[in-house]
Structure formats: structure tokens, C-alpha cells
């Protein structure tokens, strides 16, 4: 009887320990550019989608936003921003990797050829896995470019396609924010979709006092919309340890 009682106690302690481990916070690191980064809400109405992502998770998931404006896979690696993430990341943490906007740039410090872009992503994926972390690839959000009431988006070129193909070939989770944001902008149309992006009148934003007609960066409405897309996709794909903590209003 004593052995049975001890066994029951041991099992109970093990179950409690497992519950406590499951309740530990899982980190999601975000590596990307200005469309994801966090902004000072006292200075600008511009928002990054990752800035809004915490609103879609409960207290067991922590969002660590390391996205930075103007960065491509090339400059993010060169400036050792990726190394900083790898130095902090723990086993079972996630890292969402979303680049492309600045890789397509003609600026030499940013531009990455298609081959280099692919190799840079592979490097990031391998290094994350080496830390027993969980990489997720995300395509860039669509650049809201209309002509004759039709959406045309050729500025991102083949970078979203490369991201998509790489995720498939390496069996890495993909969040196709390019496709989802494109479909949304098409459904909304030219004028209504401006409310998602930094189309603002003069006097609204202290950083852009003369107003803005920006088809790349997001206002709060757009950032919340993209963040919800990301969280919904995480839940739909049932990603381990974080899917059950998604909150969709």
C-alpha cells in the first residue's frame, strides 16, 4: 500500500510539473522590416503588424519584435541583428522571418539577389533549428499599387514566390501574408484600401506633417488586420504550443 501511495504521489507531482511546463511562456521573435517593426505611438500613426500581434495571444505567449525599418536579409545579417536574436532565443521558441521589401531595393547595402536571398533565409532557418527553435517564413505584405482600378504589385518581384517555395521544400511553416493582404486589398478596392496604409492628410502625423500617400507602410487598422491574419494562420496550422493561445476577437 505504501508503494502504491508513493506511486500515486509521484504521478501527481509529474502531472503538476507537466502542467506548469505547458503554462510557461513561449516566445515568438519577429525578424523583419518596417512593415512589422514597432513605432512610438506618441509620434506617429504608423504601426507595424508585429506591434499589434500581442493583442491576439494570451499571457502564455510573448512577442519579441526585432523587426527594423530598412532591413533586408542581407543587412539584417550584416548588422548582426540576426545574431542578437540567436543569442537570445531558446529551445521551442518561434521566430517569424519576413523579408523581401528591402531585398528588392537597388541600394547596395540592402539588395540581395534572388540566389542570395534564398541562401540568407536558409542560413537563418538552419541556425534557428540548431538552437532547437522553430522558424516560420512569412511573405512580405502587398504593396498597394493601383492602376486603372486594378491592383498591380511588381515591386516585390519574385521574393514572395521564393519564400513560398523555400518553405515548401524545407517543410517550414509558411504564413502567406502577401497573398492574404493582396486578396484583401483587391476585395476592398483602390479607395477603401487606403485606410489600411499610410494615406493620411496633412496635420495628422508629426513625422509626416504634410501628409502621406504611402502604399507600403501601415496605419493601425492595417497593422491590426495583418496581425490577425498571422494569428489566424498560426491557429489554422495548429502550430505546437502557440496555436491554443491564439485569441481572435
Model-derived segments and their meaning:
Residues 1-24:
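Bacterial Sec-dependent N-terminal signal peptides
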Residues 33, 66-70, 109-110, 146:
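Short, basic, glycine/proline-bearing loop/turn elements
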Residues 34, 72, 102:
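Gly/Ser/Thr-rich beta-alpha loop segments that engage phosphate groups in nucleotides
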Amino acid at each position: 500500500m505504501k508503494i502504491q501511495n508513493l506511486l500515486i504521489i509521484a504521478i501527481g507531482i509529474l502531472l503538476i510539473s507537466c502542467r506548469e511546463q505547458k503554462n510557461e511562456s513561449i516566445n515568438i521573435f519577429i525578424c523583419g522590416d518596417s512593415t512589422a517593426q514597432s513605432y512610438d505611438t506618441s509620434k506617429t500613426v504608423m504601426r507595424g503588424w508585429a506591434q499589434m500581434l500581442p493583442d491576439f495571444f494570451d499571457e502564455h505567449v510573448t512577442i519579441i519584435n526585432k523587426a527594423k525599418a530598412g532591413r533586408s536579409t542581407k543587412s539584417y545579417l550584416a548588422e548582426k541583428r540576426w545574431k542578437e536574436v540567436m543569442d537570445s532565443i531558446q529551445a521551442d521558441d518561434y521566430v517569424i522571418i519576413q523579408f523581401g521589401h528591402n531585398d528588392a531595393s537597388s541600394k547596395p547595402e540592402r539588395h540581395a539577389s534572388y540566389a542570395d536571398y534564398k541562401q540568407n533565409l536558409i542560413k537563418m532557418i538552419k541556425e534557428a533549428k540548431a538552437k532547437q527553435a522553430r522558424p516560420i517564413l512569412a511573405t512580405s505584405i502587398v504593396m498597394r499599387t493601383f492602376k486603372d482600378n486594378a491592383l498591380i504589385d511588381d515591386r516585390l518581384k519574385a521574393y514572395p514566390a521564393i519564400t513560398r517555395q523555400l518553405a515548401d521544400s524545407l517543410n517550414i511553416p509558411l504564413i502567406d501574408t502577401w497573398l492574404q493582404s493582396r486578396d484583401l486589398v483587391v476585395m476592398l478596392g483602390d479607395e477603401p484600401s487606403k485606410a489600411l496604409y499610410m494615406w493620411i492628410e496633412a496635420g495628422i502625423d508629426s513625422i509626416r506633417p504634410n501628409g502621406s500617400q504611402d502604399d507600403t507602410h501601415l496605419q493601425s487598422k492595417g497593422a491590426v488586420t495583418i496581425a490577425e491574419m498571422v494569428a489566424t494562420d498560426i491557429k489554422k496550422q495548429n502550430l505546437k504550443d502557440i496555436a491554443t493561445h491564439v485569441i481572435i476577437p
